[in-house]
Amino acid sequence: MTRTDQDSWDLASSVGATATMVAAARALASAEANPIIDDPFAAPLVRAVGLDFFTRLAEGEIDHDEQAQRDRQLVADSIAVRTRFFDDFFLDAARRGVRQSVILAAGLDARAYRLPWPSGSVVYEVDQPDVIDFKDTTMSALGAVPTATRRTVRVDLRDDWPAALRHNGFDTTQPTAWSAEGLLMYLPPDAQDRLFDAISGLSAPGSRLATEYHPDPGSTMAERAQQFNQRWVRLGCDIDLSGLFYEGERSNVVDYLTEHGWHVAARPRQDLFTDYGRVFPDADTSQLRSIVAVTATFGEAG
C-alpha cells in the first residue's frame, strides 16, 4: 500500500483504514475496568465500517498469544493516552474561553458528540467527503446528537481547505483550538509546513494548537513504519500499513511553530503515560518512545 500525491481513500482502505484502526483501539480502551477515556461511539463506528479484523478487535473477540496480548495492551494504552491528551487540550481551551475548534483529518473522531462542550461552542470537522458522509450517516442511524454546534468541511487537506473552512462559517477573528492528531506522518514534509502555515494564517491571537511528532531524523521513518506494521500483523491485521508514512527530512515542529509566532510547550510521551496512570512500555519500543506531544498558543504566552 504505497502513497501517491493524489491518492484517495475510504475508511476501509489506505490512510482511511488507520482511522478505523484508531477507533478500534479507542473502543478497547473505553471497555477497560478503569478507563481514562470514554468513547461510546468508537465500537459502533468500527462495526459500521465492516472490516472484520478491526470489528473483532474493538469487541475484544480476538484470541492472542502472550506477545500479541502485550501488543494489544500497548495499542490500547497508547491510543488512550493520546486521546486523553487531545480531549484535555480541547476542554482546557474551552475553559479559557475558546469557543471555536477545528479537528483536522477528523476520521471517526466523535468529540463533537462526546465531550461536554460549553454553550456556544462550534466544532469543525475537516476530512475527505466520503469519510464525513459515512460518519454523518452512521451517527444519525445511532441517534447520536452533537454536544456542540458541529460543522463538517468536506475537503482533502491537500486542497484549499482554508477556503472551505471559511465558507462553512469559520471566523478568523475569533481564537481557535486546532488539533492535528495522528496526522503529520501521513503528510509529505513540505505539506506539513504548509499545514502549519495555513493554521497560523487563520489563527487569531489566543488560538491554541495540539499535535504530536517524532523529532528523530526522517531517514528512520521507514524503520518506524515497519515497527508499526509488525505490531499490527502480530495482532492479526491483514492490511499492510507500512507504506502509508512519508519519508524525508521534516521541520522540527517546536522550532517551526516558534518561528511563526507560537509559544510552544513540548512533552515526551512517557510523561503523558505517567500523568494518566499508564505504565510506559519497555525501551525497545523506540517508535513510541520518541513521540513528543506539543501544545502551542498563538500570539501570546500560554
From Swiss-Prot:
Pfam families: LCM
Organism name: Mycobacterium marinum (strain ATCC BAA-535 / M)
UniProt similarity note: Belongs to the UPF0677 family.
EC number(s) reported in the record: 2.1.1.-
Molecular function terms from GO: methyltransferase activity
Function: Exhibits S-adenosyl-L-methionine-dependent methyltransferase activity.
Protein name, as recorded: Putative S-adenosyl-L-methionine-dependent methyltransferase MMAR_1068
Keywords tagged on the record: Methyltransferase, S-adenosyl-L-methionine, Transferase
GO biological process, one term: methylation
Record-listed S-adenosyl-L-methionine binding positions: D127, D156, L157
KW rRNA-binding (keyword) present: no
